[in-house]
Amino acid sequence: MNVDPTRPRLSRRHMLALAGVAGVGAPLGLMQAVRALPLFAPVGAADALAEVPICRASDTVDEVKGAPRHVRFAYNGTGICTAAVPVALHRGYFARHNLDVEFLQLAGSTDQMLQALAADKADAGSSMLLNWLKPLEQGIDVKLTTGLHGGCTRLFAAKESGPRTVTDLKGKTIGVSSISGPPRNFFAILLSDAGLDPQTDVQWREFPADILLAALQRGEIDAIADSDPNAWLTERRANGAIVEIASNLSGDYADLSCCTLGVRSSLWASDPNAVRALTHAIRDATHHVAEQPDDAAEVFSKYTPKVAAADLAAMLRSHTHSHHPAGEALRREVLKIATDLKRASIIRPNTDLVKLANRVVIDVT
């Protein structure tokens, strides 16, 4: 652990209002200004956060010289698996790499985040790789720099009478909170691996995340596919009545990334040093999450006040936050996941996956 003798600077500006910006389409107009510190924690709490010593995954020097580089980071503060992002802010990793980072809150889906990056309304964002590969295949001009972690997507069934394996799901109905979301895409891969057709051998039904457990109990669905924190909390609410039968740490995916860091291509072209600095800051923060999950949970709890920090820490421990591949290692993972998505009929059959991986993954280390 390297201890910074000075307290890390927090960003001077924390959120940017995007609503009403000229040239933004309707989905981008849903962006709202949210101040990271005043909204989620008093100034005193932020000062206390800054006191925690900093551990680093890399010993690289700051890539950005002179005045801090302003970076607009699209972040909605809902996914515990991207806890490294607020940790990078509140524990000073952005400041150590000479970055002045603002959080932009998106009111909608990952697609809006990608549109924001491609349209130069944001500089960077993080989300599930399974959600990004289809838009990237379709031509969204965003580059991937590093994975953030593995794990966080789970499949549950009733303990007493539900299916016990993915193969048992043939002819069953799986509940999801989004038909096009990462849980549906990932478990479509596992179904395909098990010799089932995810389009015809199972049915998918969409429910609000907080209704999935009730739908299972009413017999409307036979299994639940969801991501943390909702998946974890659903299992807790069930009080032992459901069991996890698979996750995105199953099989080959035990050593693969779940979430990734993406940047707009024009930023990589115009300021590669800023992209390197951002990537190294996030990788340092993921190391912090892996080594200090209780502290990372305390940071993230300011963004999800309805969930106890102890529960958030338990979720983080169940993920693989020490796994953050970059460069060729990330390119191999993208190729593997894209290959699986093609087999599950999510990626087009004629897409050249090697070209796709080479196009979207950049080397920053």
Question: Where is each model-derived feature located?
Answer:
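N-terminal secretory signal peptides
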Residues: 1-14, 18-27
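Conserved C-terminal helix/tail region of periplasmic/extracytoplasmic solute-binding proteins
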Residues: 43-49, 339-365
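Short, glycine-/small- and polar/acidic-enriched structural segments
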Residues: 37-197, 205-206, 222-228, 244-245, ...
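Periplasmic-binding protein-like
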Residues: 75, 148-157, 240-268, 318-319, ...
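Secondary-structure end/capping motifs
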Residues: 269-346
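Structured segments of extracytoplasmic/periplasmic soluble domains
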Residues: 88-91, 97, 116, 120, ...
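Short, solvent-exposed loop/beta-turn-alpha elements that line the ligand-binding surface or hinge
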Residues: 96, 248-254, 321-330
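Pocket-lining segment of extracytoplasmic ligand-binding domains
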Residues: 130-131, 210-302
